[in-house]
Amino acid sequence: LPRPVAYGATVSTPEGIVCIGGNNSDSSLVEVSRISYNPTKGEVAVCALPPLPSPMDNLSAAFTGQEIYVAGGNENGQPCHTFLRLNLANIEKGWEQLPDFPGAARVQPVLAAGESPNGTRIYLAGGFQPILNEEEPIVPTDVLVFDPATFTWQQETVLPPFKDGTNRTLTGGCAVTFQTDKILFMGGVNYDCFLAAIARPIHLAKAEAARDSAAITRLQAEAKAYMHHPVEWYRFNTTLLQYDLSTKAWSDLGEYEQLARAGAGAVIQY
């Protein structure tokens, strides 16, 4: 890559892997690069594609046809509702601004494209909205869908809760399209553990304002211990979920310890 980068988005295309945005120790990035492999020469090449309109990180991306879609993350350092598209058959046009997705901002969401009975659709799930304007953070549990033909968003469904009734999130998880009309969702953080962590600063501020010494001590201790628990304590998602775009039905395909990751990537090899 042209320079060190993390927390960007990637998609696989017939011409290579496209790496989008991200950040490093200096700043968030607008750069978009395509990595391609020439099997005849045994060489890897990196070429630049049109940059993002603004620096973005912790975003998600999906590819369908000749188009790359990106959604969410941070834009210019702020949680956003941004939704963009790049047509690889007309890259001179650059990135196209599409309608913002509704509801909460989504940092570290997942995005996938698939074929519904009514045509191509783009599905957005997971992510979180951190504390904004002293308001409680939000971890969405719904799945949104975008119709490229009408340029409209709507709620598609909600993530199925766990067997004990607790909420599920795909924040930091993965989504990959399977057989064109199904999406596999996997990994990500635990809803309750993660929401408690990102809400802790605002709860601590309220405790300090109320001079609640017991709450202050407890919240400070929780914050200090958060990154030092045993792996099992974080309860990262191990379930492989399948969503059928034709029937709008969820299927639980089993529990796999290998899926208990946050911030990982996933691909399907046919």
Question: Could you say what each language-model-derived stretch is?
Answer:
Residues 1-270:
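Kelch-like beta-propeller repeat domains
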